Swiss-Prot record:
Assigned protein family: Belongs to the cytochrome b family.
Residue ranges of the TM segments: 33-53, 77-98, 113-133, 178-198, 226-246, 288-308, 320-340, 347-367
Subcellular location: Mitochondrion inner membrane
Reported cofactor(s): heme b
Species name: Geomys bursarius lutescens
PROSITE patterns membership: CYTB_CTER, CYTB_NTER
Keyword Membrane: yes
Protein name as annotated: Cytochrome b
Length: 379
């Protein structure tokens, strides 16, 4: 009689994905973040579901309903802070996951990579509409400023903005539809994550050396289930430390003031995980140019497979490209800091230089470094 996990139609899918999956024997801890993103997604959907049971998407009661959740609902404060900080954890894991993909050349699995970019865009959209829901000052003004960027689109811009708003300003209609989007998008993300996995399992995982490992693959279970479980424990420890000891560290104090259309906060800024893109957008003095730069800051990732010039896949043995990669990481941290600063000297020029450097490294310097390293290999 066949083993049930190999014969049962449902168990067979799980078996091929998580048990008997042939996996490279040498993948490092940087490969843990895929499973950690899955955990973050489940955490966000569960905490979000419980929050949705008590939240009301009406401009008059939204802020009060969040206060009610924190004060009156059993462990409501915990669920709310888990959800808010879970988003930060999600993006930290997401950015490390993308960084790993760039460092080890995983972007050469084009279908998996492109679906990953789509997942990133959807996650950013989900986080943006979710940030509007508590209806605090930064929620309201963040929504106003970011949606207003669409008005820069020629001809249809203004109509598009009013269509998204459901009126002539961010109001009740906007809040209601943003709540609807925030509810449905994670379910779309879950479906796309499965497609992401499907394409990954067509090719098999990459590894730190960037070379084929078919001859030495090991089953996913027990080796990588154990390893992933260790990652889960470490992530949850950091998560609970953040939620229980530093619950408001990553939030904005302005969001504890109810939304007031008549009073603009001195510095309007999105959540920390969007600041790098916000800084790139702000560094261009033209509105349409800023919107294009904002989009390109993410979509530039889609060009990486076509800009790969090196004979080696991974950066493990490429010192020039390695240096550029870490300069890129430092540049992104710099952009994140600049995005949170007011628009005044010297922050303007720092943001502009950092933005140019970001595109320069990805579009020109890394492909050039790949060609130089190819030459060095011949010496």
């Amino acid at each position: 009689m066949a083993i049930m996990r190999k014969s049962h139609p449902l168990m067979k899918i799980v078996n091929h994905a998580f048990i008997d999956l042939p996996t490279p024997p040498n993948i490092s801890g940087w490969w843990n973040f895929g499973s950690l993103l899955g955990l973050c997604l489940v955490l966000q959907i569960l905490t979000g579901l419980f929050l949705a049971m008590h939240y009301t998407s009406d401009t008059l009661t939204a802020f009060s309903s969040v206060t009610h959740i924190c004060r009156d609902v059993n462990y409501g404060w915990l669920i709310r802070y888990m959800h808010a900080n879970g988003a930060s954890l999600f993006f930290i894991s997401l950015y490390i996951h993308i960084g790993r993909g760039i460092y080890y050349g995983s972007y050469l699995y084009t279908e998996t990579w492109n679906i990953g970019i789509l997942l990133l865009l959807l996650t950013m959209a989900t986080a943006f509409v979710g940030y509007v829901l508590p209806w605090g000052q930064m929620s309201f003004w963040g929504a106003t400023v970011i949606t207003n960027l669409l008005s820069a689109i020629p001809y249809i811009g203004q109509d598009l903005v009013e269509w998204i708003w459901g009126g002539f300003s961010v109001d009740k209609a906007t809040l209601t539809r943003f709540f609807a989007f925030h509810f449905i998008l994670p379910l779309i993300i879950t479906a796309l994550a499965m497609v992401h996995l499907l394409f990954l399992h067509e090719t098999g995982s990459n590894n730190p050396l960037g070379i084929p490992s078919d001859c030495g693959k090991v089953p996913f279970h027990p080796y990588y289930t154990t390893k992933d479980f260790l990652g889960v424990i470490m992530l949850l420890m950091q998560f609970l430390t953040l939620v229980l000891f530093f619950s408001d560290k990553l939030g904005d104090p302005d969001n504890y003031t109810p939304a007031n259309p008549l009073n603009t906060p001195p510095h309007i800024k999105p959540e920390w995980y969007f600041l790098f893109a916000y800084a790139i957008s702000r560094s261009i003095p033209n509105k349409l140019g800023g919107v294009v730069a904002l989009l390109m800051s993410i979509l530039v990732l889609a060009l990486l497979p076509y800009l790969h010039t090196s004979k080696q896949r991974s950066l493990s043995f490429r010192p020039l490209s390695q240096t550029l990669f870490w300069v890129l990481v430092a540049d992104l941290l710099l952009l994140t800091w600049i995005g949170g600063q007011p628009v005044e000297p010297p922050f303007i020029i720092i943001g502009q230089v950092a933005s140019i450097l970001y595109f320069l490294i990805l579009l020109l310097l890394m492909p050039m470094a790949g060609l130089i390293e190819n030459k060095l290999l011949k010496w």
